[in-house]
């Protein structure tokens, strides 16, 4: 059995392509089932977000499994198999495990260390598990990956610092006010940066936000989309008299907020603090305003310094997390190898106990006059002899779980002791067939 991961992400395909290969939420369960029907696929999980579509699978043969996954993606989205090959990357074995761990912990995200992907990966796994397309290996591996990511985020500050300009703007406001929930904010500009600023403000707990834009209809559309208020640019002077935070991101040629405007409203505001954050280039807010008492003015350079410092902190945390991944891979491999070791040990014990039982039957026939106590003593001692004889072989078998050639050595081990253990691969295939029948039955009854 082999672990294969095929990923279409921000490194392998631009956003135009990624938009075309994203599964709708309501189509994911059926997608899991469709892929699982393929004989070469023993287990599968599909992750589909705005930045990546990935298929994780346990396959019987790497080349066959890889092809069927690529064919599945091609058919799902109307591409040729070669197109999927060109826009994706393939990871196998340890590389696939590393990829899963990096993705789940946010090391492979556009925004380094973001936590949303952890929830998305957890949801993808739970959906696959509930659909019936995971088995022994993925049920263990994905729980391991999720636990690893949670630990990575709790033990490092990788997600604690702002690494986008719009998010950093809100962080600067927090430095002045602390909690923002009770504050009023004005966002000037209804473009992409304006909407990102709005989303970060709402995410900080602020509900009282006003969108201001030169074109009122654009402000109205954005405001209604996010359930906030809106106003025209001409209302800005009066809004400045009562607001606490202003984030400006227009493409205006002249200053939107001037020194004279702020001096006028500062007399009305008295000692109330006002945070002005200018993320526009050219600037929307006239320089020098922060010389006025209780007016805090930040421009894009101030934000860049904060973002750069925070990114360095995240990169250091990412290096720490990445350094822990090899140990996780080793732990997974040892666990997988034990799947092959346990049946061998079980078969060895069964053979030994059968020999002991046959020996006791022979003793009973040849010494029929033994008392019950004498029989129990003999039985106890023969079992003790067997356990002592098995101690070292079992220890050696367990140590094979860390051996790269464990399959070959386990086969030799079985030949030496003339035992035949259950093959984990055959067991996985039988389990897959059973789950596939359950899925098919569920489809039939659901259709009816």
From Swiss-Prot:
Keywords: NADP, Oxidoreductase, Porphyrin biosynthesis. One of its GO terms (biological process) is protoporphyrinogen IX biosynthetic process. CDD domains: NAD_bind_Glutamyl_tRNA_reduct (cd05213). The record marks 99 as: Important for activity. NADP(+) binds at residues 189-194. GO terms for molecular function: glutamyl-tRNA reductase activity; NADP binding. Possesses an unusual extended V-shaped dimeric structure with each monomer consisting of three distinct domains arranged along a curved 'spinal' alpha-helix. The N-terminal catalytic domain specifically recognizes the glutamate moiety of the substrate. The second domain is the NADPH-binding domain, and the third C-terminal domain is responsible for dimerization. Catalyzes the NADPH-dependent reduction of glutamyl-tRNA(Glu) to glutamate 1-semialdehyde (GSA). During catalysis, the active site Cys acts as a nucleophile attacking the alpha-carbonyl group of tRNA-bound glutamate with the formation of a thioester intermediate between enzyme and glutamate, and the concomitant release of tRNA(Glu). The thioester intermediate is finally reduced by direct hydride transfer from NADPH, to form the product GSA. Belongs to the glutamyl-tRNA reductase family. HAMAP family: Glu_tRNA_reductase. Homodimer. This is Glutamyl-tRNA reductase. It comes from Staphylococcus epidermidis (strain ATCC 35984 / DSM 28319 / BCRC 17069 / CCUG 31568 / BM 3577 / RP62A). The gene is hemA.
């Amino acid at each position: 059995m082999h672990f294969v991961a095929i990923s279409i992400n921000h490194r392998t395909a631009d956003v135009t392509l990624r938009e075309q290969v994203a599964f709708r939420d309501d189509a994911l369960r059926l997608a899991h089932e469709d892929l699982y029907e393929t004989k070469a696929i023993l287990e599968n999980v599909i992750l589909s977000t705005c930045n990546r579509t990935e298929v994780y699978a346990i396959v019987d043969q790497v080349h066959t499994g890889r092809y069927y996954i690529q064919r599945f993606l091609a058919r799902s989205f109307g591409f040729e198999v070669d197109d999927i090959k060109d826009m994706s990357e393939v990871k196998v074995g340890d590389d696939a495990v590393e990829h899963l761990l990096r993705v789940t912990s946010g090391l492979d995200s556009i925004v380094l260390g973001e936590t949303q992907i952890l929830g998305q990966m957890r949801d993808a796994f739970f959906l696959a598990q509930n659909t019936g397309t995971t088995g022994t290996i993925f049920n263990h591996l994905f729980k391991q990956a999720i636990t690893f990511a949670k630990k990575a985020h709790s033990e490092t500050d990788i997600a604690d610092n702002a690494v986008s300009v719009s998010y950093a703007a809100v962080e600067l406001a927090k430095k002045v006010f602390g909690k923002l929930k009770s504050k009023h904010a004005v966002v000037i500009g209804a473009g992409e940066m304006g909407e990102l600023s709005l989303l970060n403000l709402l995410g900080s707990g602020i509900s009282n936000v006003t969108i201001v834009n030169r074109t009122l209809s654009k402000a109205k559309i954005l405001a209604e989309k996010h359930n906030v208020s809106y106003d025209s640019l001409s209302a800005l002077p009066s809004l400045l008299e009562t607001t606490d935070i202003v984030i400006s991101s227009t493409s205006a040629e002249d200053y939107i907020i001037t020194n004279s405007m702020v001096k006028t409203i500062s007399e009305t505001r008295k000692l109330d603090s006002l945070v002005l954050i200018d993320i526009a280039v050219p600037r929307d807010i006239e320089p020098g305003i922060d010389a006025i008492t209780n007016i805090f003015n930040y421009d894009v350079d101030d934000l860049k310094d904060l973002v750069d410092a925070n990114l360095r902190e995240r990169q250091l945390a990412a290096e720490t997390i990445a350094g822990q991944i090899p140990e996780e891979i080793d732990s997974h491999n040892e666990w997988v190898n034990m799947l092959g070791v346990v049946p061998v040990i079980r078969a060895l014990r069964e053979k030994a106990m059968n020999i002991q039982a046959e020996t006791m039957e022979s003793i009973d026939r040849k010494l029929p006059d033994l008392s019950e106590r004498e029989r129990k003593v003999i039985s106890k001692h023969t079992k003790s002899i067997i356990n002592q004889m098995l101690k070292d072989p079992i220890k050696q078998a367990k140590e094979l779980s860390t051996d790269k050639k464990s399959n070959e050595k386990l086969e030799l081990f079985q030949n030496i002791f003339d035992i035949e253990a259950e093959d984990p691969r055959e067991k996985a295939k039988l389990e897959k067939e059973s789950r596939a029948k359950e899925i098919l039955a569920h489809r039939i009854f659901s259709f009816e």
